[in-house]
């Protein structure tokens, strides 16, 4: 007896091909009709007229037969399409009864199904999302917190199954007179494959002097997955912004998640969340950017997460940038995370925020692992228009073998004192000392930081290093003699750091030594009517070296601020430099510089430079810099924080195994940056959170990046959450769409949560879930935002393809938002996604 099988996807493809063929034939027939159905006679005689009539009749008969054939063709294609759909429906119907009793048994005995998604927590209750099926399933999203005097906490996202994404944390509830509710924590990723859930955004606070809610922590990663991104801090138009949530810890081989951005507040920005710790073999996560303020001080950037204990060269996370303030002081940059216990480089310190009255201090670079690794570069100090610039951060200490970190440049001032540069770290056994950071221009100008000493066995001193012992001085003289021929022929030494660009000139930093050495910091741009552009950081040494930090853009006293310089690239081993911050401008803030690319084999990609605000919001802010590209194993760098009216920077792309970087957060109603795309085998980066605004519209969340083409189980990045609109009659920002999973085996990223709104307003629409690969779950739709009058709607959810569950529909926002419908299951096995609540 013979057996016949039907593949619905093959039937559907054949129907599509036949429909295309039908269109081509119809077009050809139509083109021929005019020349074959009404021929002109060759002459006026009867024979010519008869010949023309004969051939015209043949043409008309052909057209009539073609019309009948076309009708039959259309009926055949319709029957084929219907047959494919019937086969698919029959397969799904046959599978569902088989799964139902199995799932019922597991539900009764364990509280979760074998295959299927966890349920969403109901909006306005703060209920936790249910865990996904033990084998295949996404965790449900946490319910949003209740509105009240103090906002209620959002529910935690449910954990993914063995294969599945963790659910997003619920948004914190709105507070009428007290503190906004805390966002729920993201759910843990599936133990084998899947993405960790994003922390929920904190709730906003409406009363004078109140504080926005803290963002929820990102979920922990699975075996290969990175930790989830922390939720954005809640905003307030009359108080202090909430702190961003901490990034989740990475799985065994995963990196820590990026900390959430601090919330906007009139009287003080919220602190950025700390980056998550890397898994045992993973890199640390980047700290979140501090929130923007208008009257007081911007929020401090979050600290970078530490790399895993046994990480083989993975770096600690970079510190987050401090929040800016167009009328007050800038926030301090976060300190860089430390490298692994034995191996790994320290993370770069965060650049500080720009401030009208005073610039914030740059964050210190992280220290390296005990044996091998470079110290992290110190963050640049922030510039100021009226007061003193911010002090540069100190460079981090290296391992026994490795270069010390450069000190950060001091911030410049248009009408006050320039700040001192940060001190460079000192080498230990083999490695160069770090350059001292250049002082900022001003009246008076800041002093340069002290350079670090070279290693006791081999290594050049950093620039501006103090005098040392006679033996060490002799060592430096010998190295100078060795370097002279190479320096004369190529313009760079064999061993040693490149020189810093001169402050106030926008000169590029010099390249590091051909063997090993850090690139010099770019000089900050000149202060003038229009600020000058900052110089690019120098490239690291070919074998080993950190790229120099890009110079900050100059201050524009009557016009536009200067553009920050590009961070220097590392070559084989080393981290890329941080992009320079844009300069303050009276009319327009300067754009941030792009982060430097990571070393091919080891090292972290540089963070994009933050964009500058214009003084007192007279004009627009600059565009934030994009993160640098990762190496073979490193993730792309995070995008910089956006300026007023300008989007956050795009996350850098992975190269081979690395994930895309997180998009930068928007500021004051600007959109978040898109997450970077994963490398060939990497996951997509999470989109940046949209900026909250005291105006009419919150910024839209950035789209999640797509996973790599050959990613095995990696997920598309989650969409960023929409920003809150605090003004009466405003509308919350739209959540970003989730990124697509790998083409063969990958999960769609979850859509971002829509932004909340104030009195007489509407919540933002949740983002669409990302599409799955042939094997994998569709991404969950984002929840609609809270609306005092009308809650935001949820968006569409992709279906699974062959094996996997459809994504859950997102919840509608509290106060009448429309929930989304769940996606359909895969053709072979899987469960339909659950409808939103």
UniProtKB/Swiss-Prot annotation:
Region of interest called Disordered, as start-end residue ranges on this chain = 811-837
Task: List the induction conditions.
Answer: Expressed in both low and standard phosphate concentrations.
Show where the PE domain sits: 4-94
Q: Name one Pfam family in it.
A: PE
Alphabetically sorted, this entry's keywords are: Repeat
The gene coding this protein:
PE_PGRS4
Spans of biased composition, class Low complexity? 826-837
Task: Return the protein name.
Answer: PE-PGRS family protein PE_PGRS4
User: Which InterPro entries does the record cross-reference, listed alphabetically?
Assistant: PE-PGRS_N (IPR000084)
Query: What's this protein's family per the entry?
Result: Belongs to the mycobacterial PE family. PGRS subfamily.
Q: Compositional bias (Gly residues) at which positions?
A: 811-825
């Amino acid at each position: 007896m013979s057996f016949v099988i039907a593949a619905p996807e093959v039937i559907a493809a054949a129907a599509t091909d036949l429909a295309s063929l039908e269109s081509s034939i119809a077009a050809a027939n139509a083109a021929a009709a005019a020349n074959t159905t009404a021929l002109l006679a060759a002459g006026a005689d009867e024979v010519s007229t008869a010949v023309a009539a004969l051939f015209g009749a043949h043409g008309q008969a052909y057209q009539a037969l073609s019309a009948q054939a076309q009708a039959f063709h259309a009926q055949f294609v319709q029957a084929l399409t219907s047959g494919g759909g019937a086969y698919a429906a029959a397969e799904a119907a046959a599978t569902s009864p088989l799964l139902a009793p199995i799932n019922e048994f597991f539900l009764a005995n364990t509280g979760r199904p074998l295959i299927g998604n966890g349920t969403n927590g109901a909006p306005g209750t703060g209920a936790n999302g249910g865990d996904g099926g033990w084998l295949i399933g996404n965790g449900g999203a946490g319910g949003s917190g209740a509105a009240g005097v103090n906002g209620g906490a959002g529910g935690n996202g449910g954990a993914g199954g063995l294969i599945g994404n963790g659910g997003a944390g619920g948004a914190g509830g709105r507070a009428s007179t007290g503190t906004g509710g805390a966002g729920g924590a993201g759910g843990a990723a599936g133990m084998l494959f899947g993405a960790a859930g994003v922390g929920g955004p904190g709730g906003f606070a409406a009363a004078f002097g109140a504080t926005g809610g803290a963002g929820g922590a990102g979920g922990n990663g699975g075996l290969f997955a990175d930790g989830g991104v922390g939720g954005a801090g809640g905003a307030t138009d009359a108080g202090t912004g909430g702190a961003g949530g901490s990034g989740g810890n990475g799985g065994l081989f995963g990196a820590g998640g990026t900390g959430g951005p601090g919330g906007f507040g009139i009287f003080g920005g919220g602190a950025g969340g700390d980056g998550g710790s890397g898994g045992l073999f993973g890199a640390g996560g980047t700290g979140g950017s501090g929130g923007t303020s208008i009257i007081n001080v911007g929020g401090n950037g979050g600290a970078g997460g530490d790399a895993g204990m046994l990480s083989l060269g993975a770096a600690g996370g970079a510190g987050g940038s401090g929040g800016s303030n167009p009328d007050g002081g800038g926030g301090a940059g976060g300190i860089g995370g430390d490298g692994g216990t034995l191996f790994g480089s320290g993370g770069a310190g965060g650049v500080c925020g720009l401030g009208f009255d005073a610039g914030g201090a740059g964050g210190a670079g992280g220290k390296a692992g005990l044996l091998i690794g470079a110290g992290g570069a110190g963050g640049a100090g922030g510039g100021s228009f009226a007061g003193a610039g911010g002090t540069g951060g100190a460079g981090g200490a290296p391992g026994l073998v490795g270069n010390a970190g450069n000190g950060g440049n001091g911030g410049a001032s248009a009408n006050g004192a320039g700040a001192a540069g940060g001190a460079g770290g000192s080498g230990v056994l083999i490695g160069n000392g770090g350059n001292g950071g250049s002082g900022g221009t001003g009246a008076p100008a800041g002093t340069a930081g002290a350079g670090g000493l070279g290693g006791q066995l081999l290594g050049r001193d950093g620039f501006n290093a103090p005098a040392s012992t006679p033996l060490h001085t002799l060592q430096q003289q010998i190295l100078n003699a060795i370097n002279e021929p190479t320096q004369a022929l190529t313009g760079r030494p064999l061993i040693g750091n490149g020189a810093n660009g001169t402050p106030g000139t926008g000169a590029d930093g010099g390249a590091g030594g051909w063997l090993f050495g850090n690139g010099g910091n770019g000089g900050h741009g000149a202060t003038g009517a229009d600020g000058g552009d900052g110089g690019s950081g120098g490239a690291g040494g070919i074998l080993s070296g950190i790229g120099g930090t890009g110079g900050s853009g100059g201050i524009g006293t009557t016009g536009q601020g200067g553009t920050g310089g590009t961070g220097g690239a590392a070559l084989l081993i080393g981290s890329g430099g941080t992009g320079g911050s844009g300069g303050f401008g009276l009319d327009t803030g300067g754009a941030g510089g792009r982060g430097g690319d990571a070393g091919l084999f080891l090292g972290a990609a540089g963070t994009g430079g933050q964009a500058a605000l214009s003084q007192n919001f007279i004009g627009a802010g600059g565009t934030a810099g994009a993160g640098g590209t990762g190496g073979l194993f490193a993730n792309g760098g995070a995008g910089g924080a956006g300026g007023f009216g300008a989007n956050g920077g795009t996350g850098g792309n992975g190269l081979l195994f690395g994930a895309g970087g997180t998009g930068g957060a928007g500021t004051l109603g600007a959109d978040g940056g898109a997450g970077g795309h994963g490398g060939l085998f990497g996951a997509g980066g999470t989109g940046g959170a949209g900026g909250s605004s005291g105006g009419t519209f919150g910024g839209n969340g950035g789209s999640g990046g797509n996973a790599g083409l050959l990613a095995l189980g990696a997920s598309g990045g989650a969409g960023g959450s929409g920003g809150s609109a605090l003004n009466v009659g405003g509308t919350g920002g739209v959540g970003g769409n989730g990124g697509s999973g790998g083409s063969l085996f990958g999960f769609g990223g979850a859509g971002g949560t829509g932004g909340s709104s104030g009195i007489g307003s509407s919540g933002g629409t949740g983002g669409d879930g990302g599409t799955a690969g042939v094997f994998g779950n569709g991404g969950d739709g984002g929840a609609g935002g809270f609306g005092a009058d009308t809650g935001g709607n949820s968006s569409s959810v992709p279906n699974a393809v062959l094996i996997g569950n459809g994504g859950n529909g997102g919840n509608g926002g509290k106060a009448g938002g429309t929930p989304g419908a769940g996606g359909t299951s895969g053709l072979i096995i899987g469960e339909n996604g659950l409808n939103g609540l």
